[in-house]
Design a protein with these regions (language model features):
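Polar low-complexity intrinsically disordered regions enriched in Ser/Thr and small residues
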Residues: 9-11, 49, 194, 204, ...
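Periplasmic/ER-lumenal interhelical loops and adjacent helix-loop junctions
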Residues: 2-97, 142-149
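Hydrophobic, Leu/Ile/Phe/Ala-enriched alpha-helical segments that form helix-helix packing faces
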Residues: 59-62, 168, 215
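Contiguous transmembrane helix-bundle modules in multi-pass membrane proteins
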Residues: 71-80, 90, 96-213
Length: 215
């Protein structure tokens, strides 16, 4: 604590607000599953497409043991939306969500906990999740500043994961649903990476120095 307080940045004068800019909130939903859209304030999300169905399973399943995890997810999400937490977790200097890595760990844990239930999801629950993802998609697309290919790809992949698990979980070959779901998960990883690094997306690779330019 003393190290944070004694840091030179703490003595600097920064603008503190009770809410983030409107662009932050407009792009927040889309930024959850796309690397091309960032709300700002070092809030780097861009999770795999499977995160969206996993969160839906968490809330659509009557499992009392998951109640603390639901509260943690809701609380952490609320903290990302309130600048005071970004300011506090950044050493009381300026608003930045550097702690977002912890939010990523929560999402990863939710995926791990709900994976088995997702792979054997019932038709009724699957349809409910598809509707929820459709509503989420509509809200994200309408709110974000600029629609990109990455968000479309991620949303379609999320829907395909649910459809595959819903239709094929009763197949005679019990492994077919989880295997196809894993393939879609890796496709989402590849898609996010491609859009992040390629010139058709964020073109992040252009920020690197070529080997020949290094002294």
């Amino acid at each position: 604590i003393l190290a944070f307080i004694g840091d030179g940045r703490s003595s600097e004068s920064y603008v503190h607000t009770w809410i983030y800019s409107m662009d932050y909130y407009r792009n927040f939903l889309a930024s959850m599953i796309t690397c091309q859209t960032k709300p700002g304030y070092l809030t780097h999300l861009g999770y795999n497409a499977v995160a969206l169905p996993a969160v839906c399973v968490l809330f659509f399943t009557k499992n009392k043991s998951w109640r603390p995890l639901r509260l943690i997810f809701l609380g952490a999400t609320a903290m990302l939306l309130i600048p005071a937490f970004g300011w506090a977790f950044n050493g009381f200097s300026y608003m930045a969500n550097r702690w977002v890595w912890a939010y990523g760990m929560i999402i990863a844990y939710i995926v791990a906990v709900t994976w088995q239930d997702l792979c054997k999801i019932s038709t009724g629950k699957g349809l409910g999740i598809i509707i929820a993802i459709a509503v989420y998609s509509l809200a994200a697309l309408l709110m974000m500043n600029e629609i990109n290919h990455n968000i479309i790809f991620s949303l379609i992949t999320a829907l395909l994961i649910v459809i595959v698990c819903m239709i094929l979980n009763k197949s005679a070959k019990k492994l077919i649903a989880p295997v196809l779901a894993v393939i879609l998960v890796f496709a989402s990883f590849a898609g996010n990476s491609a859009y992040f690094f390629s010139s058709h997306g964020n073109n992040h690779i252009a920020s690197y120095v070529s080997y020949g330019a290094v002294n």
